[in-house]
Amino acid sequence: MKKYAQTAHLLILFFTLATLRSQAQNADNFETFARQHDSIFFSLYLKKDTQNYRLLLQDWERRYAQLDAATRKKYAAERADAHYNLACTYALCGQKTPALDHLGRAIEAGYTNYSHLIADPDLEIIRGEPRFAALAEPIRAVGDYLFILRHAAAYNVADARPWPAFRYDPAEKPELKALRDTYRLDSVAGSGNDLSQALNVLHWVHEMVPHDGDHGNPAQHNAQAMIEACRGGKRGLNCRGLATVLNECYLSLGFASRLVTCLPKDSLGIDPDCHVINVVFVPSLDKWIWVDPTYDTWVMNEKGELLGIAEVRERIILDQPLLINPAANWNHRYTPDKAEYLYRYMAKNLYILQCPVDSAWDLETPAAGKTMRYVQLLPLDYFKQEPAVREFSDSASGATYIFYNTNDPVNFWKRP
């Protein structure tokens, strides 16, 4: 009976492979092919079926090898994950050597999640092996985000490379006044103190427009155009779009605020992910504070005092207490876990900080003859300090982009 069942299972797998291969070749649709394989990989992992997982992965690899370079790069992470999960399957079956073999192939394919690697219970049987340590150590420098950030603590306040002073559009600029009047932002902010007003506006933007990280933003990158494009739940905005809307709302109410792009070190050039949030200057606190419209989030110390980005970064590095507001959420579908949000995701993305020189209405809508300027705060640890100024033009729009590098956090976070 067991033998018959195994034979039947192999026949089913054979016909499944034939069907998937035909789809991939005839329709040239590797995405569908890969997605279906991934589902079967997971099923075989649950069954601890190393033999058929290995056969299926060999088939996946053959198809992957036929792709052009750009498509192979697109699916490199899936390849790494497939080998990693086969390593887990072997480890759960007590087979150390093939588990280590496929872990090595996963790392060669680009697997870099060091924190998961050292904590994954599936790999417990091989974690004490010398070969495991040899495989894991090199990816610590690219996948252990706390380790990376702690090596990037140092700046240089004496950095004399010149860059323009930050500028903030006045609230009475006609377009900002129109934004304020259209959405009655004075009423949204309320009659409380400046901190409560800033947090009320953060909450309003979060409630007004959902986050959608899977699509680009509308062509017009200003608050009124983007809110209108999303009206009635037609669409959402990615983190940059939400931060742009919040920034212009703050400017329209007379707050100095900035868009802040938080970037990883990405020494391998394989991580396109970043996160965009805001800082708003609260006069009564005499400081910038962290506000994230994607998660309706601000960050505090153990006393409940609101913190700015520089303070949060320093506290992560020094392992000092941090809190996020209890009402933080993503589209009201889940509450972000503090450890995941701050100590993994933001630890990764607080390596480089980038702000526009001009905090202005419609800042990032590209147009012929338009120049967009940015300042990047780099830690001394970063491997690309030069050139001090980089300029390029976008041939499609005719817009020009200028990036200034600095190691000076004092001037970067200068009060408005």
Model-based region annotation:
Residues 75-82, 113-135:
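TPR/TPR-like alpha-solenoid helical repeat scaffolds
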Residues 150-237:
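Secondary-structure boundary elements
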Residues 318-416:
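Low-complexity, Gly/Ser/Thr/Pro-rich intrinsically disordered linker/tail segments
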Residues 26-28, 63-76:
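Flexible helix-coil transition and linker loops at the boundaries of alpha-helical arrays
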Residues 244-319:
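Hydrophobic/aromatic-rich core segments of domains that either
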